[in-house]
A protein has these predicted regions:
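Active-site C-terminal subdomain of aminotransferase-like
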Residues: 24, 32, 51, 76-179
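Histidine- and/or cysteine-centered catalytic micro-motif in compact active-site loops
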Residues: 60, 106, 151-155, 191, ...
């Protein structure tokens, strides 16, 4: 439900090639922030391989499910991505903004962002000893990752995974409670920790 249609994806890629365009990237979603839907990541990865395209996963919300032993199977195919975006300020319980991009090959970031002005030569890095400005757009930046590191040190991934699993259960409980009531409609069923519902009493329009 609410997933990418991979048949239409194949058709769109073929149509672009027919026009002489060069499709180069597909972005799959690992848990939308409105319905919790997860795209068929393994299938999308296969399509990307067939067409020599970059496969990025928007895991801003749902990538945190990887910390849940019970539910991480829902993100099967994540390991096939070339890059993943992941917001710790969504489901890793951090304050805004704390997010990350994970890449399979750091050289892609380094060769895209590495700069070598004269005033930085005294702290020049390389692929073995990376300076963060060599793998992103910012030079001076706040220590956004420190709060996540501290949280992981204090709570650990097991406790965070349990909290994520509790979020799944809360969504299911809410859905079951609403289904027992009159005039309430489930718009999208409980997925991850998301549930959409509305009040549908007679005489009321949308």
């Amino acid at each position: 439900e609410f997933q990418m249609d991979t048949k239409k994806l194949r058709e769109a890629i073929a149509a672009d090639k027919e026009k002489g365009l060069i499709p180069f990237v597909v972005i799959g979603t690992a848990g939308t922030t409105n319905t919790g839907s997860i795209d068929p990541l393994e299938t999308i990865a296969g399509i990307c391989r067939e067409n020599q395209m970059w496969f990025h996963i928007d895991g801003a919300y749902g990538a945190s499910v990887l910390l849940s032993p019970k539910y991480r199977h829902l993100l099967k195919g994540t390991e096939l991505a070339d890059s993943i975006s992941w917001d710790a300020h969504k489901w890793l319980f951090q304050t805004y903004g704390c997010a990350m991009v994970l890449v399979k090959d750091i050289r892609h970031l380094y060769h895209s962002f590495h700069v070598n002005p004269e005033y930085l030569k005294d702290v020049e890095g390389d692929l073995e000893h990376v300076n963060t400005w060599d793998i992103g757009m910012e030079l001076t930046r706040p220590a956004r990752g420190l709060k996540l590191w501290l949280t992981l040190q204090v709570l650990g991934t097991e406790l965070i995974g349990s909290a994520i699993e509790h979020g799944f259960q809360l969504a299911v409980w809410a859905q079951e409670a609403l289904q027992e009531l009159d005039n309430w409609e489930i718009v999208s069923k409980a997925q991850l920790a998301m549930l959409n519902f509305r009040y549908t009493a007679d005489g009321l329009t949308e």
